[in-house]
Amino acid sequence: MTQPVAKRFPTPSIDRLPDDIRTRLLAVQEKSGFVPNVFLTLAYRPDEFRAFFAYHDALMDKDGGLTKAEREMIVVATSSANQCHYCVIAHGAILRIRAKNPQIADQIAVNYRKADITPRQRAMLDFAMKVSIEANKISEQDFTDLASHGFSDDDVWDIAAISAFFALSNRMANVTAMRPNDEFYMMGRLPK
């Protein structure tokens, strides 16, 4: 039995979407072989889709002091804390691929403090979790600790922005009952 993309809101047909959104979905499908359900779910509200993915791309696709794998570590750790099934599975797949490590996503999702990561990455995730769960407790000491691990002000901003953005994503995925695509489960687990 085929599961719905998201249970609580209608999923628009790709051929009925605005041209720019349809073009993006088809490009993603061509590159990955499938359309991730987040695209189909959020296409229900085209203006919000555009804003969401513009900010996503600005945070996740740029060069900077954080590697793309480290950005995905933030997503997986905070999404796990927020109990977001979709984001843990989907971004876990991306993390496995970007880190070239089939075990890292599971380790981070279960308990990043015991994962095979560097002290710098642990400090990054400690701060990301604080932003995600108890941002009201952020203090100057957090910035001092991050600086001692070599993070610049822009890096700290990126850690915070990724954590905050995916808090929105986690909540929308849970509200819509978004289902991870089956393809995500095995991605990055086996050598090509």
Give a label for each model feature:
Residues 1-192:
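Hydrophobic alpha-helical segments
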